[in-house]
């Protein structure tokens, strides 16, 4: 086994169990380990402030227990400029962005890596993400692989990473399943062992999303219509809805034509008229797409795809892999055709491509290719 004692790793400590166990495992592997806690949002109410303070206290307690130094850094300005403003602009344009992906790209593997490099003189950074990486020996580019725990795999959120960033990153829990991570934390007496996983928007936490978004973007209520143009309800703002969404339409129990009692789903957003089109039944043709067009492409090996390629794709997190064909348009744009039509393909979200366990990269869904029978 190679000697790690001369290698310094800076672990992104979030105050959660995954980063806690990552730090422990790296220490066991002989690395010089230090922690870095990022503050990426300026809280504006007591509840948020308490949560952030609790996370920092937990991160500090874990570092004290492991005997490692914890640094702190404030990236709130970078987060606002490079993540949050894009997030708002996308919602304003009627799309549904994924801020976690942008946060990884701009903050955790850019601002964090630069600070770890320039100020803390790190050889590697480490995060508590459920992904794996290859360690090639013959000058080949490292690859990013799915996490071993298929239920927790987070490669979808990391597709923007380049092979250079992968080469500088370690993912200690990527080879473990979540119950094992909690077991290790408990065995080592780490305070985060039973702490629940965080959900909600990256760094903004679990506040009420509608209320939160309404603080920054004025909502424009409008009509909910059937595809035939019948008004069947009111929406509070198109930005609060995403394609394929069932909950929150407040038109449940309403029968469609011919006494149809199937549930209603968001089938389309008509931005010009500020109208939400609702359809009945999850198999409605309007919900289906034959493929998609994607741009803002990031390939892990940084080599554009020039030839037609068979692979699989995910158009949202925790989705089953969809067999597909990538047809390059140019270096910045691709067309993707699914083997079978798919529902709820959403502009603004990311399409992430795989060959077996290897994450190839991905792009932003610009538009869906509608089902030809719709």
Curated annotation (Swiss-Prot):
What SUPFAM superfamilies would the database entry show?
Adenine nucleotide alpha hydrolases-like
Q: Which keywords label this protein?
A: ATP-binding, Cytoplasm, Disulfide bond, Nucleotide-binding, RNA-binding, Transferase, tRNA processing, tRNA-binding
Main location, first listed in the record: cytoplasm
Q: List the disulfide bonds.
A: 103-202
What's an example of a GO molecular-function annotation for this chain? ATP binding
Give the UniProt entry's GO cellular component terms. cytoplasm
| Residues annotated for ATP binding in this entry | 12-19, 38, 128
Task: Specify one Pfam family.
Answer: tRNA_Me_trans_M
| Locations listed in the record | Cytoplasm
- Which BP terms does GO give this entry? tRNA wobble position uridine thiolation
Per the Swiss-Prot or TrEMBL record, the active site comprises 103 (nucleophile), 202 (cysteine persulfide intermediate)
Q: Which reaction does it catalyse?
A: S-sulfanyl-L-cysteinyl-[protein] + uridine(34) in tRNA + AH2 + ATP = 2-thiouridine(34) in tRNA + L-cysteinyl-[protein] + A + AMP + diphosphate + H(+)
Site note Interaction with tRNA applies to 129, 349
Segments for region (Interaction with target base in tRNA): 98-100
- Which Enzyme Commission number(s) are on file for it? 2.8.1.13
InterPro entries xref list: MnmA-like, MnmA-like_C, MnmA-like_central, MnmA-like_central_sf, Rossmann-like_a/b/a_fold
Extract the ranges annotated as region (Interaction with tRNA). 152-154, 316-317
Q: Which family does it belong to?
A: Belongs to the MnmA/TRMU family.
Primary role: Catalyzes the 2-thiolation of uridine at the wobble position (U34) of tRNA, leading to the formation of s(2)U34.
Q: What name does UniProt use for this protein?
A: tRNA-specific 2-thiouridylase MnmA
Q: Which organism is it from?
A: Vibrio parahaemolyticus serotype O3:K6 (strain RIMD 2210633)
Give the gene name: mnmA
